[in-house]
UniProtKB/Swiss-Prot annotation:
Species this protein is from: Acidovorax sp. (strain JS42)
Protein name: GTPase Der
GO molecular function, one term: ribosome binding
CDD domains given in the database record: EngA1, EngA2
InterPro entries linked: G_ENGA, GTP-bd, GTPase_Der, KH_dom-like, KH_dom-like_a/b, P-loop_NTPase, Small_GTP-bd
Signal peptide: none
Family, as annotated: Belongs to the TRAFAC class TrmE-Era-EngA-EngB-Septin-like GTPase superfamily. EngA (Der) GTPase family.
GO BP terms in the entry: ribosome biogenesis
Gene3D superfamilies per UniProt: 3.30.300.20, P-loop containing nucleotide triphosphate hydrolases
Domain EngA-type G: 3-167, 180-353
Binding site for GTP 1: 9-16, 56-60, 119-122
Domain KH-like: from-to ranges: 354-438
Entry keyword set: GTP-binding, Nucleotide-binding, Repeat, Ribosome biogenesis
Length: 447
């Protein structure tokens, strides 16, 4: 499970600059849910083998009437609660302020791992300006320059150190045991809890909460027709006696983590509300993560024929990038249409892990080129030689040849369609990578 780092601090200390540095670019922002997570942004970061989620909490300016805690509760408190470690950003050039003291007092009371980052410290590593921040009682001040990238790598190492992260291979333990890890993702009140409880009731399971750290999602193991599953909860599933009580509490971090750790994601939509921006955000993250996906539209019984037609068009338009995903229309409350979901989930899992032999891929590639060759780009005509599989979950096909950087997106989609049809790839993204062979005569010509 990816650890979560929250960036906390008063306005204009450089949190957003540090956020963009950690996530490499502004394009790395994966979720910005208006209204729900106002003034908080979520992004992906990576250091070495370890990936992590970063939360930029935005600044806050407490006034005399509201006080620090009310303002913290509105924006920052939720992010801090979701985080495994807090990076408290201060402005070395601006100096220590009363707000810094207020924030430090709050963080100390939480008892959560905290790293103090002295930003804007270009050329001030040994300056007396750093000394005053020791008054905050949060230990050593680590000088960084978010704008120039100085000290950022060591800051991340320090933040991740107390979390005792497992080796990457341990994350794949469930896959080795042929267990399908299934995450049910969706906005609040789309019916995730109802669907989960219906499943558990149908299977008459003795389910249990698996113990884990604060960053672990709750998992419910169960078996259906001989296939083992592990349901990753994003709805706040809790046990009450022998009955599970699901609490719909939307957490962006929990949703992102569940998607990352799943083999298959069931994206649940609400037929009565259509496809919203939040739905599209979640769908986009599923695609970005490379997870297999099945789409289910819940509360299908609550809309008339005209509403159904409008919804189908909305899905085709707003979620066109998931057109490879099986689409189901269900009513979790009335238990209608739920059975066929399992077939699609298993099919998506098998597609994501399908092995594709090199001879077959190369034959399909050659047949595709004979049927329709890639267009010339100026004086360059891409020449494709052979293909092989470069990975699974999601499946990756690597194509080798010359001048492949000139292959158009339209031609890649043409190839994707042919590969999908041959290998019956349903419910999984398919990534096609082009590798241009180096010219062995380049060095001789330049010598």
């Amino acid at each position: 499970m990816k650890p979560v780092i929250a960036l906390v601090g008063r306005p204009n200390v450089g949190k957003s600059t540090l956020f963009n540095r950690l996530t490499k670019s502004r394009d790395a922002i994966v979720a910005d849910f208006a209204g729900l997570t106002r003034d908080r942004h979520y992004g992906n970061g990576r250091q070495g083998k370890h990936e992590y989620i970063v939360i930029d909490t935005g600044g806050f300016e407490p006034d005399a009437s509201s006080g620090i805690y009310r303002e913290m509760a509105r924006q920052t408190q939720q992010a801090v609660a979701e985080a495994d470690v807090v990076v408290f950003v201060v402005d070395v050039r601006g100096g220590l302020s009363a707000q810094d003291h207020d924030i430090a007092n709050y963080l100390r009371r939480l008892g959560k791992p905290c790293v103090l980052a002295g930003n804007k410290a270009e050329g001030m590593q040994d300056s007396m300006h750093l000394a005053e921040f020791y008054e905050l009682g949060l230990g050593e001040v680590h000088p960084v320059s978010a704008a120039h990238g100085q000290g950022v790598r060591s800051l991340v190492d320090l933040a991740l150190k107390p979390l005792a992260l497992p080796e990457i291979e341990e994350e794949d333990a469930a896959a080795e045991k042929n267990v399908i890890r299934l995450a049910v993702a969706g906005r609040p009140n789309v019916g995730k809890s109802t669907l989960i409880n219906t499943w558990l009731g149908e299977e008459r399971l003795v389910a249990f909460d698996m113990p884990g750290t604060t960053r672990d999602a709750i998992s419910v193991p169960f078996e259906r027709n001989g296939q083992k599953f592990e349901l990753i909860d994003t709805a706040g599933l809790r046990r009450k006696g022998k009955v599970f009580e699901a609490i719909e509490k939307f957490s962006v971090v929990k949703t992102l983590q569940a998607i990352e750790s799943a083999n298959v994601v069931l994206l649940l939509l609400d037929a009565t509300q259509g496809v919203t921006d939040q739905d599209a955000h979640i769908a986009g993250y599923i695609l970005e993560s490379g997870r297999a996906v099945v789409i289910a539209v819940n509360k299908w019984d609550a809309v008339d024929d005209y509403g159904r037609q409008q919804l189908e068009r909305s899905i085709e338009t707003c979620l066109s990038f998931l057109k490879f995903a099986p689409l189901h229309f269900i009513s979790a409350k009335k238990r209608q249409g739920i059975g066929p979901l399992w077939s699609s989930i298993i099919q998506a899992y098998k597609s994501a892990n399908r092995k594709m032999p090199t001879p077959v891929l190369t034959r399909l590639l050659q047949e595709a080129v004979q049927f329709q060759s890639p267009k010339r780009s100026g004086m360059f005509r891409p020449k494709m030689r052979y293909a092989h599989q470069g990975g699974m979950n999601p499946p990756v096909i690597v194509i080798h040849g010359n001048s492949l950087e000139h292959v158009t997106d339209a031609y890649k989609r043409f190839l994707e369609a042919r590969f999908r049809k041959e290998f019956d790839l349903v419910g999984t993204p398919l990534r096609i990578e082009m590798k241009t062979s180096s010219n062995p005569y380049t060095d001789k010509q330049n010598s």
